[in-house]
Amino acid sequence: MARDRRDTYYWRAKDEGYRSRAAYKLFQINEKHEVIKEDDTIVDLGAAPGGWLEVAKKISGGKIVGVDLRRIKEIEGVETIKGDITSDETIKKIIELVGEGGADVVICDAAPNLSGNWSLDHARSIDLTTSALECAKKILKPKGHFIVKVFQGDMFKEYMDKVRESFTYTRAFSPKASRPESAEIYVIGKKLLTAPLKIDDKFDVTIKKIGAKGNGIAFVEDFVVFMQDEVKKGENVRIKIVDVKPEFAFAIVIGRYDEELNEKNEE
């Protein structure tokens, strides 16, 4: 395919020795959102031909693993796996390379084979990025980060909501290196949530103590939950989770069992 002479990133990639113009997208994403740091362990899903692997290695200098159904031409200092990211066998191989502690960052610039039918291509993109998200959740360490390319469309909001459920910080970002006519956008998720709960979950708890700011405190599987409503120590309540942070959550009270018990006793 003939290249537009105005495609400066294509020619820049050739001049600077990168395998694809996509390299500059990752540079720009990282400059804006500071996802990759020095010595990070990084896994690139759908990594062929390897443009993002080269950038990840340059920024991090740490352990870099590329995964793709196709063979990835060797890159110095980068390990590769030929496999399907939805396969348990591939997940096992990734964990063997990055260690049980998990990866610091998972990146994915993969795109589905395009048919020319936009609705079909968008659906395929969402399916692929959902697989990437599920894989990332299995191989990231707690508070790890995620970058993935998504095609915009009517299912994009639903996908963003899925990412929000799993990460403390989420943003959608379009780097300058993306072509103006492209519908691609990059979703960034920072600080993987490893809490035993999520927004809208409901629990029956006992208020164990009152914090310094007057917040009632309860625990769900040893995870701290702060009440946003007035409660008393020892009170039994039903709560609904309204916000989740890496190390604690906030909840509102939706039922007070002690009050119900008192009402029954009065009857």
UniProtKB/Swiss-Prot annotation:
EC code: 2.1.1.166
SUPFAM superfamilies linked to this entry: Nucleic acid-binding proteins, S-adenosyl-L-methionine-dependent methyltransferases
Keywords: Cytoplasm, Methyltransferase, rRNA processing, S-adenosyl-L-methionine, Transferase
Top EC class, one word: transferase
Record's subcellular location: Cytoplasm
Reactions the enzyme catalyzes: uridine(2552) in 23S rRNA + S-adenosyl-L-methionine = 2'-O-methyluridine(2552) in 23S rRNA + S-adenosyl-L-homocysteine + H(+)
GO MF: rRNA (uridine-2'-O-)-methyltransferase activity
Domain TRAM: 196-255
Binding of S-adenosyl-L-methionine, residues: G50, W52, D68, D84, D109
Catalytic residues as annotated in Swiss-Prot or TrEMBL: K149
Signal peptide region: none
Spans traversing the lipid bilayer: none
rRNA processing recorded as keyword: yes
GO CC annotation: cytoplasm
PANTHER family: PRE-RRNA 2'-O-RIBOSE RNA METHYLTRANSFERASE FTSJ3, RIBOSOMAL RNA METHYLTRANSFERASE
Role description: Specifically methylates the uridine in position 2552 of 23S rRNA at the 2'-O position of the ribose in the fully assembled 50S ribosomal subunit.
Protein name per UniProt: Ribosomal RNA large subunit methyltransferase E
Taxonomic source organism: Methanococcoides burtonii (strain DSM 6242 / NBRC 107633 / OCM 468 / ACE-M)
